[in-house]
Amino acid sequence: MKVFAHRGFSYKYPENTLLAFKEALKLDIYGIELDVHKSKDGKLVIIHDEDIKRTFKGEGKVKDYTFEELRNFKCNKEGFENNDDCKISLLEDVFNLIKDKDIVLNIEIKNDVIDYENIEKDVLDLIKEYNLERKILISSFNHKALEKVKKLNGDIRIC
């Protein structure tokens, strides 16, 4: 059986944070799943919901804030509010974390509610920049997004 750490080690640590991913890497897992959105300034950011209020202390949509503004929101899980590894991070931060690890990364493109312009291309470009094509699975509840991914890169694995 192949086990993925859903949103990192989210049972114990704040979901979709660098801390949750770092702790997941200590486990006997096949891969990590995460969710990606785009900030107002076009950065690929790691967070599950379109709105920040469930996981961070703040209000509003991810798309309405720049990455620097998003970094100012504190995690709302008790005991982790002041941990820098529990802030909204960039996809490239996770790539730097896993690039030398024997791990698969499932990137869920979150554009089923908000249609982020060119998010598929931006994700694929970053994957190529880091030479991580063999470690990546792309998923989405938006079937058109998966079709777009395959059109842009027929070799990338989708699920």
Identify the meaning behind each predicted range.
Residues M1-C159:
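Phosphate-group recognition and catalysis centered on beta-loop-alpha active-site segments
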